[in-house]
UniProtKB/Swiss-Prot annotation:
Tissues expressing the protein: Retina.
Gene (name only): GUCA1C
Residues bearing PTM Deamidated asparagine: 3
Lipidation (N-myristoyl glycine): 2
Entry binding sites for Ca(2+) 1: 65, 67, 69, 76
Protein name: Guanylyl cyclase-activating protein 3
GO terms, biological process: regulation of signal transduction; signal transduction; visual perception
InterPro entries in the record: EF-hand-dom_pair, EF_Hand_1_Ca_BS, EF_hand_dom, Recoverin
Keywords from the UniProt entry: Calcium, Lipoprotein, Metal-binding, Myristate, Repeat
Residues that, per the record, bind Ca(2+) 3: 143, 145, 147, 149, 154
Length: 209
């Protein structure tokens, strides 16, 4: 289990001592060593969601399940924690891209981005932009060859060159509350104050390195 590639590539690792604490906590919660999708949603308090919101959470879980066996084991779980603690926005964008690329073909089309936007909208509430406005804005700015699809290179480079667009994308796909529960709610050595700012959780810093 957990032998797939890490979620975000070359990311900052959790210190060894903290990893041991995480491991004990994970095994206390999940004695089998595996977390199911239902347990993931229970952990986050995300029961009774509508279909669109459920789709978004399912996709988040699937990106954590790197070896695609239907479970999240400890190595996959700690990789997710590493991502949350990662300060490099480029690494987060790589994960965003993987999240939006629903069919896993290495590119994002308008329908995939639209589906994910609407799923997050159902989870987080109404956005400033309509789904159509958001999709048109993103593709107008960063679909360099106008083929109706975004490659990973186009996605990351486009965001790096347009801070305003980066802010819009970050806010429009803000699932920091979902991820923060994992980080703050399950790590004994960290603060668990629900009012903790996104910056302190490493989620609100929109910067490229």
């Amino acid at each position: 289990m957990g032998n797939g590639k890490s979620i975000a590539g070359d990311q900052k690792a959790v210190p060894t001592q903290e990893t041991h604490v995480w491991y004990r906590t994970f095994m206390m919660e999940y004695p089998s060593g595996l977390q199911t999708l239902h347990e993931f949603k229970t952990l986050l308090g995300l029961q009774g969601l509508n279909q669109k919101a459920n789709k978004h959470i399912d996709q988040v879980y699937n990106t954590f399940d790197t070896n695609k066996d239907g479970f999240v084991d400890f190595l996959e779980f700690i990789a997710a924690v590493n991502l949350i603690m990662q300060e490099k926005m480029e690494q987060k964008l790589k994960w965003y891209f993987k999240l939006y690329d629903a069919d896993g073909n290495g590119s994002i089309d308008k329908n995939e981005l639209l589906d994910m936007f609407m799923a997050v909208q159902a989870l987080n509430g109404q956005q400033t932009l309509s789904p159509e406005e958001f999709i048109n804005l993103v593709f107008h700015k960063i679909d360099i060859n106008n083929d109706g699809e975004l490659t990973l290179e186009e996605f990351i480079n486009g965001m790096a060159k347009d801070q305003d667009l980066l802010e819009i994308v970050y806010k429009s796909f803000d699932f920091s509350n979902v991820l923060r529960v994992i980080c703050n709610g399950k790590q004994p050595d960290m603060e668990t104050d629900s009012s903790k700012s996104p910056d302190k959780a490493g989620l609100g810093k929109v910067k490229m390195k």
